Amino acid sequence: MSAAALELGVTHGAVSRQVRALEAQLGLPLLDRGARAVAPTPEGARLAAELAQSFERMQAAVARVRPGPLTLSSSATVMMRWLLPRLDRFKRAHPSIELRLTVSYGEVDFIRDEIGLAIRNSMVRAPPTALAETLIREEIGPVCHPDYASRVIADGPDALAARARILGTATRPEAWAEWARTIGRPDLGIAPDEVFGHFYLVIQAAACGLGFALAPRLLVEDEIAAGHLVAPLGFVPGPHDMQLWTAAHLRHRPDLRLVAEWLRREMAGTR
């Protein structure tokens, strides 16, 4: 009751009166009102679930016909290191398209959050309301600053594990173990010496000479080309893909289709 009142901007009592009025109209109880808690009756739970689906369909119908910006969601790392550096080309080519960017992680509620497209790693399962497609197979490899590489001389996995300072991220704690398995060295026993809270921080730490980070080529290729990072051991196909999720109810919007095609071309250019 309190949560509903807060969302609707009314009092607790107003919500309670509306529920009682609905119960009187239907001729059956919708809530079990205990001394300490309120819970829906089976009929109330069933009605709530079906009404929620109906409200979602109404929101989706409105979104299909309402003009407005197209929202693209991605992680902060993908947005900072891949999307934003390429966005100017898109805006110059398509100045009439209003594209709004939002940072989010994990699952997406396309209808509630009014999101049209989302870039996600395949570690996250796409929701039923999304059309998911693979944009690119992730390639991963250890990267560091050129000066650090010349000091450490990690010319192989064993040298890397023995000599280098290993940087990890809390968002992908198994990354180094996955890389070791991918190169056929599950016995390597490589583990981070320092863990950062975000992926973009561990890449920046590597660029500042603090050690080796394990990164997808997609997110570091610009800095490698600029000479700010090197990948002494190269890159290998990783266990995950980069995916594009499309809101099913918006899939026919012309601006969405154009942005999606641009993302496909840009990702293909990074192979």
For each feature predicted by the language model, list its residue ranges.
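A late-sequence structural motif
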Residues: 235-271
